[in-house]
């Protein structure tokens, strides 16, 4: 509900001042059952309350907004998977990550200019914005560890069913 209400309030504020709304959403609006990358016009089917609330936010943004769906966001500022892995690789002998969920990492240094371009260029509608190439969390973490000079063999593959504790919001597998 918060994801819908906050977007509705932003849309109303934008309407009052004549600003264009760019709303960032997520791949959680899909169920992950396709074996290919999702397209903007694919039907949504969220698996979790979070995904449903993000979809409600997309609807609350209205038809004149720019909706940008992204995934696996990481960058120099704020918390993200890359920073978590870099911390854990020095604290733990092994790291276990799921090999049965795939997605596209998205770097903020690439996403931010695109959001600006979409927001100022008169674009409306739904856009998917990620970096190229899909990987599993397991593959992504192995690459992070290797790039940081660590041993990628310290990263062990597990399945989503093996996660302990289970994730609070079911994540689409693709």
Task: Tell me what each language-model feature is.
Residues 1-22:
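NAD(P)-cofactor binding segment of oxidoreductase domains
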Residues 2, 41, 48, 103-106, ...:
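Residue-level signal for the nucleotide or nucleotide-sugar donor/cofactor binding architecture
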Residues 5-6, 20, 29-68, 72-75:
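Catalytic helix-loop patch of NAD(P)-dependent Rossmann-fold dehydrogenases
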Residues 16-17, 64, 148:
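Helix C-cap/helix->beta junction micro-motif
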Residues 59-104, 108-110:
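NAD(P)-dependent short-chain dehydrogenase/reductase
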Residues 109-117:
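Amphipathic alpha-helical segments that line or abut small-molecule/effector binding pockets
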Residues 114, 121-167:
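Mid/C-terminal beta-alpha module of Rossmann-like enzyme folds, strongest
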């Amino acid at each position: 509900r918060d994801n819908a209400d906050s977007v509705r309030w932003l849309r109303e504020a934008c309407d009052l001042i004549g600003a264009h709304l760019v709303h960032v959403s997520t791949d959680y609006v899909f169920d992950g059952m396709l074996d290919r990358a999702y397209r903007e016009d694919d039907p949504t089917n969220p698996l979790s309350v979070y995904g449903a609330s993000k979809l409600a936010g997309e609807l609350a943004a209205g038809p004149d907004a720019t909706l940008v769906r992204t995934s696996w966001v990481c960058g120099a500022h704020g918390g993200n998977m890359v920073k978590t892995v870099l911390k854990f690789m020095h604290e733990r002998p092994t790291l276990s990550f799921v090999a049965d969920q795939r997605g596209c990492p998205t770097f903020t240094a690439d996403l931010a200019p695109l959001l600006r371009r979409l927001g100022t260029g008169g674009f409306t509608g739904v856009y998917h914005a990620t970096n190229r190439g899909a990987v599993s969390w397991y593959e992504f973490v192995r690459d992070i560890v290797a790039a940081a000079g660590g041993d990628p063999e310290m990263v062990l593959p597990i399945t989503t069913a093996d996660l302990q504790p289970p994730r609070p919001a079911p994540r689409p597998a693709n």
